Amino acid sequence: MRVYAAITLVLVANTAYIGVEAWGGLFNRFSPEMLSNLGYGGHGSYMNRPGLLQEGYDGIYGEGAEPTEEPCYERKCMYNDHCCPGSICMNFNGVTGTCVSDFGMTQGELCRRDSDCETGLMCAEMSGHEECAMSSECDISRGLCCQLQRRHRQAPRKVCSYFKDPLVCIGPVATDQIKSVIQYTSGEKRITGQGNRLFKRMPFA
């Protein structure tokens, strides 16, 4: 009789243990799968996925965010095989030459000097509302920096735009290099120069 009671007790305890494990699995409040997009747990964090604001993040902020040198630009060569695809080896004097672009850069491509561009194009800083990746690509002397622009029913994009606060810019911005003040049209001057004239007209003010 004691043997049956002991076996029954072991079976009840075993089923109770399995039941508790199952209930805990159903009603566990924290699950890393539910919060994987916030970086909790090992099921994929926000750093593994390129999000909207994390594009091009190199792990550095502020200083040292200058663009890295391209390994193919002006590389020393002897044959075209030593250059990257889209480049050819030009021997100007002697045996060794330098790798240059096969075709000139078109509008919107990054260049370093005027000779990199196609005929009729000049290499210049980006003007306003052109797409960018970092503020160093925009013309800071005109007061432009790279900003994330969101518009209704459009995908967000990074463009060179005028700024007042350097905190809205992507990447470091040297505000002391701004040479020109933003020029407003006459209508904008009139609207912004009024100040609080509306409140002065009110009879109760």
UniProtKB/Swiss-Prot annotation:
The primary site where this protein sits is secreted
Alphabetized, the UniProt keywords read: Cleavage on pair of basic residues, Neuropeptide, Secreted, Signal
Question: Where does this protein reside within or beyond the cell?
Answer: Secreted
Q: Does the record bear Zinc-finger in its keywords?
A: no
Superkingdom field: Eukaryota
Q: What tissues is it present in? A: Expressed throughout the nervous system (at protein level).
Q: Which GO terms describe its cellular component?
A: extracellular region
The propeptide segment or segments lie at 16-188, 202-205
Give the UniProt record's GO annotations in the biological process aspect: neuropeptide signaling pathway
Record bears the keyword Metal-binding: no
Signal peptide start-end: 1-15
Q: What is this protein called?
A: ITG-like peptide
Source organism (scientific name): Camponotus floridanus
